[in-house]
From Swiss-Prot:
GO MF, one annotated term: NAD binding
Name of the protein in its database record: Glycerol-3-phosphate dehydrogenase [NAD(+)], glycosomal
Positions with a binding annotation for substrate: 126, 275-276
Gene Ontology terms: cellular component: cytosol; glycosome
Location in or out of the cell: Glycosome
Organism annotation: Leishmania major
């Protein structure tokens, strides 16, 4: 068993000459702000040249993270080769549905560079690819060696990360020593951003994807005026759906009750800062998905994830009633109240939770 009782002191932290972030949305920009405390230079790749130039001039990414002044050592560029040249760490924060296309179109030299120099790759994207039903790290793993890959996940709203509000996340790799090295790189000296290492990459990716779908459901319940008790029930039962899918995909489940699992699920399902929660709330109030998307520039990843998630669950024969009903509300235009009624018509059931502790007849309960 891997011990989690490990403390990091400031002397253990690692600093780099340069890091590159591929993906310039709110979260990519926020992670660049974290890295600006650990690197001499941080380069952020943005797809449009003119927009990248304007960000550099204004020192603000007002498209996705308005009001946050960029650190002086952060540079935006639309040139892939310029972005990664000299980088000692590569982060991917490109939306899941566009990740493969990026590698196929622009990734050749980047991939060769990372392989030749053994540059660690941190996957920060969340979701499930529609065409293959793969998670982001699986997609990235088709192009980069597995020994370079880690996953970052956990409760981390971009605006708080970018402005140095205290945040804890998980860094996962199949090799705990790889995860611990990334932990030392990403944790900041002022402890405003702290990473915990784990080996449950599957659990981290499943939780990161499914929580966005569940957050839409939490928003729907809020829009219907269902209250906090309903939200707590959704979070609890939703966590079990994450558990069951993680088990079916071969994860060890250790991340489910950690930062990437319960932590991120609770946050995303409980705040108007969550784009997924906000989309769900508007659906609950009667707006159509088309109406919502016309007025929002930011991506609510749960919308893109719901459909492939349901197909993946069916393929693996995993029962996910909450995610199924959320999918039907989002894509089949099912009335949200009808979805709630269907969830509640399943009959009385046992809670279905295994005991955490073994109890023998010789040691009866003291309560």
């Amino acid at each position: 068993m891997i011990s989690t009782k490990r403390h990091i002191n400031t002397n253990e932290l690692l600093h780099l000459s340069k890091a590159v972030v591929f993906g310039s949305g709110a979260f990519g920009t926020a992670l660049a702000m974290v890295l600006s405390k650990k690197c001499r230079e941080v380069c952020v790749w943005h797809i449009k040249e003119e927009e990248a130039r304007l960000v550099n001039e204004k020192r603000e990414n007002d498209l996705y993270l308005r009001g946050v002044q960029l650190a002086s050592n952060i540079i935006f560029t639309s040139d892939v080769d310029e972005a990664y040249k000299g980088a000692e760490l590569i982060l991917f924060v490109i939306p899941t549905q566009f990740l493969r296309g990026f590698f196929q179109k622009s990734g050749g030299n980047l991939i060769a560079y990372a392989k030749a120099r053994q540059v660690p790759v941190l996957v920060c994207t969340k979701g499930i690819e529609r065409s293959t039903l793969k998670f982001p790290a699986q997609i990235v793993g088709e192009f980069f060696p597995s020994n370079l890959l880690s996953v970052l996940a956990g409760p981390s709203f971009a605006i708080e990360v970018a402005t140095g509000v205290f945040t804890c996340v998980s860094v996962a790799s199949a090799d705990i020593n790889v995860a611990r090295r990334l932990q030392r790189i990403m944790t900041t000296g002022d402890r405003s951003f702290v990473c915990w290492a784990t080996t449950d990459t599957v659990g981290c990716e499943v939780a990161s994807a499914v929580k966005n779908v569940l957050a839409i459901g939490s928003g729907v319940a809020n829009g219907l005026g269902m209250g906090l008790n309903a939200r707590a029930a959704l979070i609890t039962r939703g966590l079990l759906e994450i558990r069951d899918l993680t088990a079916a995909l071969g994860g060890d489940g250790s991340a489910i009750f950690g930062l990437a699992g319960f932590g991120d699920l609770q946050l995303t399902c409980s705040s108007e800062l969550s784009r997924n929660f906000t989309v769900g709330k508007k659906l609950g109030k009667g707006l159509s998905l088309e109406e919502i998307q016309r007025t929002s520039k930011a991506v609510a990843e749960g919308v893109a994830t719901a459909e492939p998630l349901v197909r993946l669950a069916q393929q693996l024969k995993v029962t996910m009633p909450l995610c199924q009903q959320i999918y039907e509300v989002v894509y089949k235009k099912k009335n949200p109240r009808a979805a709630i009624a269907d969830l509640l018509s399943c009959g009385l059931q046992d809670e279905g939770l295994p005991p955490l502790f073994k109890k023998s007849a010789a040691t009866p309960s003291k309560l």
